[in-house]
UniProtKB/Swiss-Prot annotation:
Similarity section: Belongs to the methyltransferase superfamily. PrmA family.
Source superkingdom: Bacteria
Subcellular location: Cytoplasm
Lineage, highest ranks first: Bacteria, Thermotogati, Thermotogota, Thermotogae, Thermotogales
Family annotation (InterPro entries): Ribosomal_L11_MeTrfase_PrmA, Ribosomal_PrmA_MeTrfase, SAM-dependent_MTases_sf
Record function comment: Methylates ribosomal protein L11.
Disulfide bonds: none
Listed GO MF terms: protein-lysine N-methyltransferase activity
Protein name per Swiss-Prot or TrEMBL: Ribosomal protein L11 methyltransferase
Reactions catalysed: L-lysyl-[protein] + 3 S-adenosyl-L-methionine = N(6),N(6),N(6)-trimethyl-L-lysyl-[protein] + 3 S-adenosyl-L-homocysteine + 3 H(+)
Annotated source species: Thermosipho africanus (strain TCF52B)
Binding site for S-adenosyl-L-methionine: T119, G140, D162, N203
EC number from the UniProt entry: 2.1.1.-
Length: 260
């Protein structure tokens, strides 16, 4: 179905991109992308329905409000395969990609054009800690890129959940494109989760991670592994009382492996 979207376009400078992405991540704003032309760099916010221009705490030059279709929108996103982490490639189409693992993802409104540092950190930890046959929960799965990666790394049961219906829709489409046995559900944290898991990965904002940790032990098998990402430097002290096994950092973002 070729949906019609409402877009707000802003002209920005290159040095604003990181701060904008940081603000959007912390405020759970997923419906955006960036693009460049000879006229400069632009930020586009995308909405499914008619929307008033939203406030952004940046000095941005508003360019226009326009409508576009889902087919045209996808053309503005990732068009070429790229190496996501070592040995793992993301391919928006059926290209002949030479890699250990290839994930075919059509970016949707569940995330922006680039894959965030937090996603890459999560993926690197998944590759390090996941063993074939593990049961994996992806809490806040977004596009399901981590769920799909877990399955391709040899996981047994993989469940991806997200509270955003747009993310769930995009995740299901991506699972189908990759022809993997991954279950996707809509869920507010653990509200629609059953069973126990050897590994739980969650790439969401720090405050929600702290909230999730209250119930997480009920869903973790003995000696299970927990991967937490989406933690900006200023929020890292929130996790000081947890048993941190490993800590990786990229730019201002942190990912932790903890044992409970």
């Amino acid at each position: 179905m070729n949906k019609v979207f409402n877009e707000f376009v802003y002209k920005i400078s290159q040095d604003q991109i990181e701060k904008i992405e940081e603000y959007f991540f912390e405020n759970n704003i997923k419906n955006y992308y960036f693009y460049e032309t000879k006229e400069g760099t632009f930020l586009v916010l995308v909405f499914e329905e008619k929307q008033e221009k939203i406030f952004l705490p940046f000095n941005l030059e508003f360019v226009e409000n326009r409508t576009t279709t889902s087919e045209d929108w996808v053309k503005n996103l990732i068009t070429k395969p790229f190496e996501f982490i070592e040995g793992v490639y993301v391919d928006p189409d059926h290209n002949n990609v030479d890699g250990e693992i290839v994930i075919r993802i059509t970016p949707g409104l569940a995330f922006g054009t680039g894959l965030h540092d937090t996603t890459k950190l999560s993926a690197k930890f998944l590759k390090k800690y996941l063993r074939p046959g593990m049961d994996v929960l992806d809490l806040g799965c977004g596009s399901a890129i981590l769920s799909i990666l877990a399955k391709k790394l040899g996981a047994d049961r993989v469940l991806g959940v997200d509270n955003d219906p747009l993310a769930v829709e995009a995740a299901k489409e991506n699972v189908e494109r990759n022809n993997v046995d991954v279950e996707i559900r809509q869920s507010d944290l653990f509200s629609n989760v059953d069973g126990k898991f050897d590994l739980i990965v969650s790439n969401i904002i720090a405050e929600i991670l702290i909230e999730a940790l209250k119930d997480l032990p009920k869903f973790l098998k003995k000696d299970g592994v927990v991967i937490l990402s989406g933690i900006i430097d200023s929020k890292l002290p929130l996790f000081k009382n947890y048993n941190i096994v490993e800590h990786w950092r990229s730019n201002e973002w942190n990912a932790l492996v903890i044992k409970i």
